[in-house]
Every structure is written in structure tokens, then in C-alpha cells.
């Protein structure tokens, strides 16, 4: 459109220049004709002046209009140039916009591809996050297992240490206990030997007195022998024993009356059992009527003494518990049970054998 306008302006300018040329040519021709007419006819100066002034006025008006048209043409040309530059810029923008509009489908396809890739990346990121969480869990489990193994190792070492200490302490305690047991057994053996010796001597004295006089005399208290304090207490308890029948008191009276009758029948000079005038109420004497009854009474007395000795050797606790009550002596009619606490000891067997030999000696 602007090119057409420019072409029109150029054609107008050419037409204007051609018109001016034609006018100049016509004026030249008119001058030539005037000269010819001047020659032919007489000049008319007033008409020429009028024409000249008129042509001069028209040429001035034309020249002024030409200048004005030239200025307007230059102004229009500048504006046309500016419009051309502006529209060239707009045309470039439009072309760029057209190219961009043509690239919109490609952009949309690329955008869809990027969106799908972003979705895949999001899924990959989620999977990676889950893997990282699982890895953290595995690391925590490994750390826990490592700490657990370390604690188990420390516990095993502590158990081994304490087991060794326990074994060493147990060995020391076992050795100390064995030493104490040996010492206690040795002391018990010594004490049993001393008691056996003491009771054997006391029994031998009682047997000698009984065999020589025919009476068994029990006093309130005897003099202590040596430094055997524990045995003195036991002997004092034995000496303070009262002849009491557990089952029936009448059996003892019957036994004493029968023994008195038989002793009076066999030895009338000796007399029945009675208290001596100088003896205390606690001194009890029994007279043997015959040799067979004497042996029978000796065996029963030896068995009761053996039971008493075994009862006194059972321990200091039983001695203290029995010291509060009055000691009891079983009658000859009851069955005598031997103490099983000292049956395994050779000293008790030797004591029984010595008692049997003493009872069979008369």
C-alpha cells in the first residue's frame, strides 16, 4: 500500500515537472511567434504587459505551490518512511508471532512430553524416597543389631567373669567348708572318744561297785573329773535322773516287791530293799537276789545306760532341750531301741562290745 502511494507521489512529481517543461516550451514558442508577429505586426505593449503580469503572477503562485507541495511531499515522505519503518517492525513482529503460532503445536507436544517426564520423575522421586526410608530402616536395624551384639558380648564377658568369680569363690568356700568339716569331725571324734572313755570309766566304776556290793547307788552329784565341762553337765544330768516308769508306776512297785520277796527267800539274812539310815532320799539301792536275776538286771541296766549315753551324744541342742525336763528311764518290760545316730561309728561298736563283755564277765 505504501509502495503504491510512493509510486503515485513519484508520478505526480513527474507530471508536475513535465507540465513545467511543457509550459516553458510553450513560452519559448510564444516568444518566437511574438517575434515573428512583431515582425509582421506592430507590437501591442499594453496587452503584453497584462499577459506578462498575469503569467508572472501564475508562475509565482505555481512556484509557491510547488515549494509547498515539495515541503508537504518531504513531510509526507518522512512520515511515509517512519510509517514504513513502523510497519516493517510490526510486520517482523507479526511474522515472529506467526512463526510462534506455527510452533504452538510443537510446544504443546513438548509440554506434554515434559509433563509426562515430570510425572515419571515424581514417581521415581517417590520410589527413591521409599528406598531411602527403607535404607534408613536398614541402617537403624544394623545399628541396633550391632549395639545388641555389643551388649550380648559384654553380657557374655560379664557372665564369664562372674562365673569365674563364682567358681573361685565356690572353690574357696568348698575348701573352707571341707576344712571346717574335717575340723568339726575331728573335734566330734575327739569329743566322742573322751565321752566314751569317761562313760566307760563311770560304767566300770558302777559295775565294780555293783558287783562287789550288790547295790546300785546313785548320788545327787559327783565331783567333776578333769576339765570335761560338757561331759560333767551330762553326767550331772544322768546322776539326777529319777527312776520313773513311763507306762505304769504299778509295774515298778510289782517289780520291786517281787525282787524283795525273792531276795528275802534266797538270802534271809540280807533283808529286803530298804533305805540305809544315813542315805538321802535320792539314794536308791537295789539288792540282787540270785545270780541269774543279777545277770538279767545287769543286761537291762547296761542297755538303758547305752541308750542314755547315745542320747547324750546326739548334740548340745538336745541336751539343752532335755535339761529342762526330768530325765526318764524306761522299764525292763519295754523294748529298748538303739540310737541310730552313732551306729555307723566304730567307737559305738567298741563301746557295745565292751559293755557286753562287762555284762558277761560275772
UniProtKB/Swiss-Prot annotation:
Gene Ontology annotations for the cellular component aspect, listed alphabetically: axon cytoplasm; BLOC-1 complex; endoplasmic reticulum; endosome membrane; melanosome membrane; neuron projection; nucleus; plasma membrane
Location(s), subcellular: Cytoplasm; Cytoplasmic vesicle membrane; Cytoplasmic vesicle, Secretory vesicle, Synaptic vesicle membrane; Endosome membrane
Coiled coil location: 109-180
Keywords: Coiled coil, Cytoplasm, Cytoplasmic vesicle, Endoplasmic reticulum, Endosome, Membrane, Nucleus, Synapse
Domain of life (superkingdom): Eukaryota
Similarity comment text for this entry: Belongs to the dysbindin family.
Region (Disordered): 263-362
Record protein name field: Dysbindin-A
Pfam family, one: Dysbindin
Role of this protein: Component of the BLOC-1 complex, a complex that is required for normal biogenesis of lysosome-related organelles (LRO), such as platelet dense granules and melanosomes. Plays a role in intracellular vesicle trafficking. Plays a role in synaptic vesicle trafficking and in neurotransmitter release. May be required for normal dopamine homeostasis in the cerebral cortex, hippocampus, and hypothalamus. Plays a role in the regulation of cell surface exposure of DRD2. Contributes to the regulation of dopamine signaling. May play a role in actin cytoskeleton reorganization and neurite outgrowth.
Subunit structure: Component of the biogenesis of lysosome-related organelles complex 1 (BLOC-1).
Membrane topology: Peripheral membrane protein
Record's keyword annotation contains Cell membrane: no
PANTHER family documented for this protein: DYSBINDIN, DYSTROBREVIN BINDING PROTEIN 1 DYSBINDIN
Start-end of Low complexity biased regions: 271-282, 298-314
UniProt-listed GO biological process terms: anterograde axonal transport; anterograde synaptic vesicle transport; neuron projection development; platelet dense granule organization; regulation of signal transduction; regulation of synaptic vesicle exocytosis
Originating organism: Danio rerio (Zebrafish)
